[in-house]
Design a protein with these regions (language model features):
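Anionic-ligand binding patches
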Residues: 2-8, 14-32, 36-199
Length: 199
């Protein structure tokens, strides 16, 4: 029988795995990345973060036989009709890296001024206790800010260097890990998840 503490993260993103391991370090879980278990990535055909997270969690739970935690997240720019949104990881193409995605986003927003540069990070986390879990836990966090015109900072990953936190004015890549955990969309979603697990 599979130990419930062995939880698979339905992601091949090593940065995301490291961040979630840090954020969940006090839980009795052993978090394993999908890549470590040779679980292939599923198609993510949906148009919402919630649907994509459910697809990923169910896929990982089915193939691993373990509890599965999925995170679908991205940056949303209202002036771009919500783009990059659910396509954040592949905004500049299926094989794009963070730099290419950032470059495309900055190019698409170069004429935007003031409030039009507002944006938000969105994170939806789903926990499924089996592939047939009839009531998965769904948690969502939002982090509001605005787009920088140039990348700033060396920390974080993804779009962090161009996301300016609304309260501090620092980019997500300029924040310490502790500051980021407190403010971030992922930190907020995980706080909701913890509350649901405790309740």
């Amino acid at each position: 029988m599979t130990d419930w503490r062995d939880v698979v993260l339905a992601s091949h993103n090593q940065h995301k795995l490291e961040e979630l391991r840090s954020l969940l370090a006090d839980l009795p879980w052993r978090l394993h990345g999908a890549g470590e278990l040779a679980i292939p990535e599923p198609d993510e055909p949906a148009c919402t973060f919630v649907e994509n997270a459910l697809i990923k969690a169910r896929h990982a739970a089915r193939l691993s036989g373990r509890w599965a935690l999925a995170d679908d997240s991205g940056i949303v720019v209202d002036a771009l009709a919500g783009a990059p949104g659910v396509h954040s990881a592949r905004f500049a193409g299926p094989k794009a890296d963070a730099k290419a995605n950032i470059d495309k986003l900055l190019k698409a927003t170069e004429t935007l001024e003031g409030a039009a540069r507002s944006c938000r990070f969105v994170c939806v986390i789903v926990l499924m206790r089996s592939a047939d879990d009839p009531s998965p836990i769904i948690a969502e966090g939002v982090w509001t800010g605005r787009l920088s015109r140039i990348p700033r900072g060396k920390g974080g990953f993804g779009y962090d260097p161009v996301f300016l936190d609304a309260s501090s004015g620092l980019s997500a890549a300029e924040l310490s890990p502790e500051q980021k955990h407190t403010l971030s969309h992922r930190g907020k979603a995980l706080a909701q998840l913890r509350a649901r697990l405790a309740g």
